[in-house]
Amino acid sequence: MRFLGHASSAEGLHVHRPEEIIMLVAESGAGGVLDPQERRLLENTLRWRDLTARQAMVARTRMLGAPVDLPREEMLELLASSPHTRLLLYEDSIDNIVGTVHLKDLMCPPAGAWDARRVVRTVPFVPEAAPVAEVFAQLQRRRQALAVVLDEYGGTAGMVSVDDVVEAIVG
């Protein structure tokens, strides 16, 4: 195209597809140029666009949740015995999540009789097959820390947080 007076925007550049970069990273790791941690971080970063919510999520059996009508003191006890600051709240079963309650809302409840429904924070719901990159972007856009992951039947499969996404990349 240069002979027609059109310059290529990639002229002089070595452009690589992600698969080729992964191969270069693997070869650099095998050749001792990268240590194993650097290699894993680079490979995970390049593969994160292929990662799904299911692959990064915390399974429902490991989620911290409680019925929305649980007394406030019991919610506080659940959070006190865990490393978390948020508690998933559900109506009837874990398949019917209504949102989360934050520790600070439990510590400083609104005046009047306790009703978690008054302080519950909504959470987004995403399908298991949702790309982690899209889930991460949605959480950032909505300024939320976690999303509930739904299985193919609409039941709760698990949850994925910003920290889970970072962990999936960093390892």
Which sequence ranges carry the predicted segments?
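Low-complexity, charge- and small-residue-enriched intrinsically disordered regions
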Residues: 1-16
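Soluble cytosolic regulatory domains appended to membrane proteins
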Residues: 12-171
